Design a protein with these regions (language model features):
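Conserved core of the PLP fold type I
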Residues: 59-190
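N-terminal small-domain helix-loop-helix segment of the aminotransferase-like
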Residues: 2-94, 101
Length: 190
């Protein structure tokens, strides 16, 4: 079990979150709330598994064992009620590369892709670097909280818009979109 009260100094350990503050923001004393990176120790069992693997001494290419694919299938079934095939599972090293893969797979250069700002900056960068056209549908603050501006979104939609990148929980505003909001979004983009 993790000890969430134990504070670990990560400065000097090649931590992008902590070691890149001065380079990125010009101030090494800021509180780095700019990246989704935890500051808690992993459970001891995880450390032991990594050490056991490292003790083998060879670090060549690895495959995806059936146990991994079965774990993903089980999780999707348990949490979403979805029965998925192993062939549908694609590993990605992180969310940013997955975004880029999806943009490339489902759109063509020049297509328009919508993001809802303020949003995690790699969303916009991934759209631009893939040669797509970025459209911004800014979130609005209503009743003291961020909400989607579906009226504005509907006005932006045309045949050249091929994708909307939805962030939930939304980074950086922290909103988890409700079922009703997601249904309204789905209705808007039909």
């Amino acid at each position: 079990m993790s000890n969430f009260d134990h504070i670990i100094n990560r400065v000097g350990y090649n931590s992008k979150k902590w070691d890149a503050c001065e380079e990125t923001f010009g101030d090494k004393e800021i509180i780095p709330m700019w990246i989704a990176d935890m500051d808690f120790r992993v459970p001891e069992k995880v450390t032991e598994a990594i050490e056991a693997r490292a003790a083998h001494g060879i670090f060549g290419y690895t495959g995806m064992p059936d146990s991994y694919l079965e774990a993903v299938q089980g999780w999707m079934k348990k949490h979403h009620g979805w029965a998925i095939e192993k062939e549908w599972i694609c590993h990605s090293p992180g969310v940013v590369s997955a975004l880029s893969f999806l943009i490339d797979a489902f759109t063509e250069p020049g297509d328009k892709v919508i993001v809802q700002s303020p949003v995690y900056y790699p969303f916009a960068r991934s759209v631009r670097t893939s040669g797509r056209t970025l459209l911004d549908n800014p979130l609005i603050i209503k009743d003291g909280r961020y909400q989607m501006d579906l009226e504005s979104l509907e006005a932006q939609l045309d045949d050249s818009v091929k994708m909307i990148l939805l962030c939930s929980p939304h980074n950086p505003v922290g909103r988890v979109w409700s079922r009703e909001e997601l249904e309204a979004l789905a209705e808007s983009i039909r």
